[in-house]
């Protein structure tokens, strides 16, 4: 029974906490929890515990918060727990080879893509950005590479035309625990079937930056609309008007050809703010000026119509 495995859990954000909660709810024996050190957050920059730490302490589990797992004393914390397996979900620290080899069954990771597609830091966002039809989670055996280990279990889900990174995150946070619990059972009873990743199918999910999220009107309307969903809720697609950043929460594509230069405002009405792109027209539907709440294009036009005069070009 997988419930008898001695499990170390390592994770930090809410996505990881949902996996820990599922393990505990299904009766698994979690002998210790590793999470990142408390970080300053909020306006007061008060030290805040991670969601994983909060849950672990609620459940009375031993919590360890090393700054790194490279020092011998940090590695000894892992060794002393004599775990059968270490489950790693969005932990945020590198596991050295010595740590990977400590548990009897090694370390397994829940990754938010269908490997080998989208190895790396931002798999959920990149699957949307690229226009993938589906994504999912992969449970893999960890090795010293970046998401290069053998795949143990996969679950997939479709990506809809309405999905944002936020909604996709929630879907994968439901799928991941299902896959994890199944994988632990297979590891415990010896039925897991590791599958080597096909290196010819590898793509990398590079980290997002605020600068990348700045709208580049030379791109196609379809690509920009995907970017707006991929970068929601962070870092948020944005444009600059009169030196102010304006976030874009929602847009749609109008498949009409235009000879106008990319960035040219074509129409601004209750249907939205229509802007020429490198290919097609992007219709801005929901925007958020600096210091304000998100609002419909119509509401923004009521107060800032001078920003969106047809014929003007957005930077």
From Swiss-Prot:
Coiled coil: none annotated. It comes from the Bacteria. InterPro entries: Fmt, Formyl_trans_C, Formyl_trans_C_sf, Formyl_transf_N, Formyl_transf_N_sf, Formyl_transferase-like_C_sf, GART_AS, Met-tRNA-FMT_C. Keywords: Protein biosynthesis, Transferase. PANTHER family: METHIONYL-TRNA FORMYLTRANSFERASE, METHIONYL-TRNA FORMYLTRANSFERASE, MITOCHONDRIAL. GO terms for molecular function: methionyl-tRNA formyltransferase activity. This is Methionyl-tRNA formyltransferase. The keyword rRNA processing does not apply. It catalyses: L-methionyl-tRNA(fMet) + (6R)-10-formyltetrahydrofolate = N-formyl-L-methionyl-tRNA(fMet) + (6S)-5,6,7,8-tetrahydrofolate + H(+). Attaches a formyl group to the free amino group of methionyl-tRNA(fMet). The formyl group appears to play a dual role in the initiator identity of N-formylmethionyl-tRNA by promoting its recognition by IF2 and preventing the misappropriation of this tRNA by the elongation apparatus. (6S)-5,6,7,8-tetrahydrofolate binds at residues 113-116. It comes from Shigella sonnei (strain Ss046). It is an enzyme of class 2 (transferase). The gene is fmt. One of its GO terms (cellular component) is cytosol. Gene3D superfamilies: Formyl transferase, C-terminal domain, Formyl transferase, N-terminal domain. Its EC number is 2.1.2.9.
